Amino acid sequence: MSLLLTLKDAQKDAMKAKDKERLKPIRMVLAAIKQREIDEQITLDDAGITSVIVKLVKQRRDSYTQYKDAGRDDLADIEANEITALEAFLPQ
């Protein structure tokens, strides 16, 4: 199964389970994929989708570090949860 289908299935499952903490990063990934496809006028394969996810994880890690340094543990915890949710879709 392609990574895009896996993401869409995970979105459906999170919506059915009413799991907002898991749904938010999945929607974010799908939006970033669609944006890149529109901007570059291409259809992304699994490697392209993986690169989008890696970029988003890197952004979240940077935000996590900044929030920790600023003493905003509440926001840092949210970023950590998003990192965990995104890393579940990266290949091992």
What is the role of each PLM region?
Residues 1-92:
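N-terminal cationic and glycine-rich segments that engage phosphates or anionic surfaces
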